[in-house]
Amino acid sequence: MRLSEFTTLFLLFSVLLLSASAEQCGSQAGGALCASGLCCSKFGWCGNTNEYCGPGNCQSQCPGGPGPSGDLGGVISNSMFDQMLNHRNDNACQGKNNFYSYNAFVTAAGSFPGFGTTGDITARKREIAAFLAQTSHETTGGWPTAPDGPYAWGYCFLREQGSPGDYCTPSSQWPCAPGRKYFGRGPIQISHNYNYGPCGRAIGVDLLNNPDLVATDPVISFKSAIWFWMTPQSPKPSCHDVITGRWQPSGADQAANRVPGFGVITNIINGGLECGHGSDSRVQDRIGFYRRYCGILGVSPGENLDCGNQRSFGNGLLVDIM
């Protein structure tokens, strides 16, 4: 064999060897997914054994989570989730011991087609950033001079702080159970019997009789928040439809300055208290979380982040714990 032919074969073999050794999936491979239903390990390799799929070893396409067509691993990895919520397991937080885990989040998301999987990669990343930002504000344990800044302390609390009431509104459709209280719980701090009832029905759990499941079962906890996010409550659109660009404001919305963007989501969640009166520290806190999370995911936050000049849709359905 001539020297030139040997050199060519050697170079070809080297290229193939390097290609074979490159990471295959997840954050190490630009969000790529594994084929044939394989798990993506925390190191970026595809496989089907415990080293790839086991708790703590799997970053995406994990057992119990959504499949390749609806997987969140291409949008947010376990390590990104931990970076965003890096103080959620602080000793001062109710959610310590990893209650709000990545696996619980991904598992819950699998029950809601379209969540974090609608549109192009920019739209998907913005939805995850917006969801985690709004829920981080609702559960934050941060303060202005907190270590790593105020926007690193989301998902600290499980239950509404202080001495909340029972949040029971007389209802024949969603009757309050004796001795049960419907104060804020979980990532979105869902409150009131008229929210616990339909949420429980949607996710297949009796939350009217067992409201504290939202603060004791991690998957149910995330499901309660994603249910609220995905569900329109007239005249409000769903948060999902707003952030993915599916919502088109009506004439009444435009007259109220309610235009597509993160600000309308704040209006949906707690506009009766936070929107329509100029600058509000709670709104700015939500925006601060959103900007930070968009930065981690490598996407711009878009426009219309504030709701200071928007008229509210009506009274907020949730309790604000700030």
Curated annotation (Swiss-Prot):
This is Basic 30 kDa endochitinase. GO terms for biological process: cell wall macromolecule catabolic process; chitin catabolic process; defense response; polysaccharide catabolic process. Its EC number is 3.2.1.14. It comes from the Eukaryota. Keywords: Carbohydrate metabolism, Cell wall, Chitin degradation, Chitin-binding, Disulfide bond, Glycosidase, Hydrolase, Hydroxylation, Plant defense, Polysaccharide degradation, Secreted, Signal, Vacuole. The modification 4-hydroxyproline is found at residues 66, 68. Defense against chitin-containing fungal pathogens. Residues 1-22 form the signal peptide. Residues 23-64 form the Chitin-binding type-1 domain. One of its GO terms (molecular function) is chitin binding.
